UniProtKB/Swiss-Prot annotation:
DNA ligase that seals nicks in double-stranded DNA during DNA replication, DNA recombination and DNA repair. The gene is lig2. Residues 197-208 have a biased composition (Basic and acidic residues). GO terms for molecular function: ATP binding; DNA binding; DNA ligase (ATP) activity; metal ion binding. ATP binds at residues 312, 319, 334, 363, 403, 476, 482. The active site is at residue 314. This is DNA ligase 2. GO terms for biological process: cell division; DNA biosynthetic process; DNA recombination; DNA repair; lagging strand elongation.
């Protein structure tokens, strides 16, 4: 597929605002690419989402704005420098428009940098080149990366340059999210195949005499129903195409995406094998999936909702997904970054304890020499360490607590109940020492006692889980609840913002929130950025209220005069050098816009310190 064709599809999608029409246009793009080889289709799916690599891959381009600006300037000609690119960025507001504003196509001397460059850009060549950019390392790697990018931009038309620049920074800005791509796969490949199957069935002379196909195993696999024979549900089964055609296609595609964590792969299988092929996708060692997530819970209402409640300790640690083939071990963070090398003691522990292929969900916790839990930041010190790992290992001790299993000994376990997964976990380790504490109860008092014990031991609280629930990757439903102490909200003032993307390109999508430096001053220090908690309508309203207070703009970033107060919830306040207050909010969210409060009512840093350290406020 010519990259120019892809770019024109992207620009057409960008001009559309209606969600259904955007899905239709993406579907048209996929079916166009679908007439080509598997690799091209897979690449187009990733590109339309603004990524070069599958979601499960920890590989990144790692191209910052500065290098991109320099490369665009180089491709634009000798009279253009990066300062000119940055000036245009301030004028146009986004890098794609800046790249499109230059006459890049036709630069000479390409053969010195990319001797295998085709006469025109193709999707495959762009993908191959960007992968080479990501792989460049060692002495001279930055120069090689710049030359490779220069080779692409030097051949790019205006539309190609617009899309290429956005793709490199992972900012497509066209309103295409994961749900859009999922629905486009359904409408492009699943529904047409289902219609064709239906017509074939209707054309049979004996169609009326054919009884409905039985499909218990497929329904169980897609719906997560665990009431029938669950021992069969973990076995490897091939789907009957006639049966699978009766399953909700949305559920089939969603489940395939959860298990594979690869949109390109799912699109290719949907085209080639239909629903039956998607149903047969299974977990794979070395291909991490999204973690199942929990919602915050204010009380013990779960007792009234579930038949029983599973209680686990809520650690103040970092989530890891453990993959082992019974010998070698790989560790992945919640963001699917490979963290195997920084955590050698966890690798050693799992290697000793687990001798069969397995995928496990666990929490890594930093502990003192006495075994007491340390703050979350200490764990991050280990995760981020690339050098002198042995020295850091001596400095920060780690424990691992395994609390779930997704795959054991060639069997996927996502669709069996939590209580059964925990039993398999106990059998796998043949001990409870490595496992997160686990107990079942129907008594609210037991939950309260467990939470009190966890808090007194220095942990965050408890997790409450439905013992009959299946494991839904990437889902934040009502089956896992975080039961922690109530945290007060903060009244903070908006002092900056960033423009949104896609459908939210004309409103602020992220806000910098700040506290007063002292209780009697009108000076402010930032505590972080918040991007959740507001509806589209609320974002529009808040943007209009903030516009008169804009001090300056620099590309996507806006400086704002302190005027509008927002109520912000959070999970924790941490010390951080990132913001000038010296603190940062963990998982902040806007609870509401406080029009009833003036900036003099904004919380002070002394209160922040009090909430963090217990020091008396001024």
């Amino acid at each position: 597929m010519q990259f120019d064709d892809f770019a024109n599809h992207v620009i057409t999608i960008e001009a559309e605002s209606a969600d259904l029409e955007i899905t239709s246009l993406v579907s048209k793009l996929l079916t166009t690419a679908g007439n080509m080889d598997d690799k091209t289709l897979s690449t187009v799916v990733r590109f339309i989402k603004g990524t070069v690599f599958p979601a499960w891959s920890s590989q990144t381009l790692d191209i910052g704005p500065a290098l991109l600006h320099t490369t665009i300037a180089q491709a634009a000609g000798p009279n253009v420098d990066s300062a000119d690119v940055e000036n245009r960025l301030a004028e146009y507001g986004e890098i794609g428009a800046v790249a499109a504003s230059y006459d890049l196509n036709g630069q000479q001397g390409l053969s010195a940098f990319t001797p295998s460059t085709p006469d025109s850009l193709t999707v495959g060549h762009v993908d191959k080149t960007l992968r080479a950019v990501a792989s460049a390392s060692g002495d001279g790697s930055e120069s090689r990366r710049r030359n490779l990018l220069f080779g692409l931009f030097s051949q790019a038309s205006s539309s190609e340059a617009r899309v290429l620049a956005r793709l490199i920074l992972g900012e497509m800005r066209i309103g295409v999210g994961t749900g859009t791509v999922r629905d486009a796969i359904i409408s492009g490949f699943i529904e047409p195949a289902a219609d064709a199957d239906k017509k074939t069935l209707e054309s049979r002379e004996d169609a009326k005499s054919v009884p409905p196909a039985s499909q218990p195993e497929i329904t169980n696999k897609i719906s997560g129903d665990t009431s029938p024979n669950t021992s069969e549900s973990v076995q490897t089964k091939k789907s009957d195409p006639d049966t699978s055609s009766n399953v909700d296609p949305s559920a089939v595609v969603e489940r395939a995406l959860q298990v594979s964590n690869d949109y390109g792969m799912v699109a290719t299988i949907a085209r080639n094998q239909g629903q039956a092929g998607l149903i047969d996708i299974s977990l794979e060692l070395g291909r991490p999936i999204q973690a199942m997530l929990a919602q915050a819970a204010d009380g013990v209402d779960a007792v009234d909702t579930w038949d029983a409640v599973a209680i686990e300790t809520k650690f103040d640690g970092a989530r890891v997904q453990i993959h082992t083939d019974g010998e070698s071990v790989s560790l992945y963070s919640r963001n699917m970054e490979d963290v195997t090398d920084p955590l050698p003691e966890i690798v050693e522990f799992i290697s000793q304890k687990v001798t069969v292929p397995a995928i496990l969900d666990a929490e890594v916790v930093a502990v003192s020499d006495d075994g007491d839990p340390l703050a979350f930041q200490e764990v991050l010190r280990r995760f981020r360490r690339k050098y002198d790992i042995d020295a850091m290992r001596e400095s920060v001790n780690l424990n691992v607590y395994v609390f779930d299993c997704l795959h054991i000994d060639d069997a996927d376990l996502l669709d069996i109940p939590l209580r059964e997964r925990r039993e398999k976990l106990r059998e796998l380790f043949n001990t409870t020492d490595a496992l997160s504490p686990f107990q079942l109860t129907t008594d609210p008092n037991v939950i309260a006692q467990a939470r009190s014990k966890a808090l007194s031991n220095g942990h965050e609280g408890v997790m409450l889980k439905d013992p009959d629930s299946t494991y839904n990757p990437g889902s934040r439903g009502q089956h896992w609840l975080k039961h922690k102490p109530d945290v007060e909200t903060l009244d903070l003032v908006v002092t900056g913002a960033e423009w949104g993307e896609g459908r939210r390109a004309n409103v602020f999508g992220t806000f910098v929130v700040s506290a007063r430096t002292t209780a009697d001053e009108q000076q402010f220090n930032s505590l972080g950025k918040v991007a959740t908690g507001l509806t589209d309508d609320q974002l529009t309203t808040l943007t209009e209220q903030l516009r008169p207070h804009v001090r300056s703009e620099d590309g996507q970033t806006v400086m704002i005069e302190p005027a509008i107060v927002v109520e912000v919830g959070y999970e924790e306040i941490q010390r951080s050098p990132t913001y000038d207050s010296g603190f940062a909010l963990r998982f902040p969210r806007v609870v509401g816009i406080r029009h009833d409060k003036a900036i003099s009512d904004v919380d002070s840093l002394s209160r922040i310190k009090h909430l963090t350290t217990g020091e008396s406020p001024d």
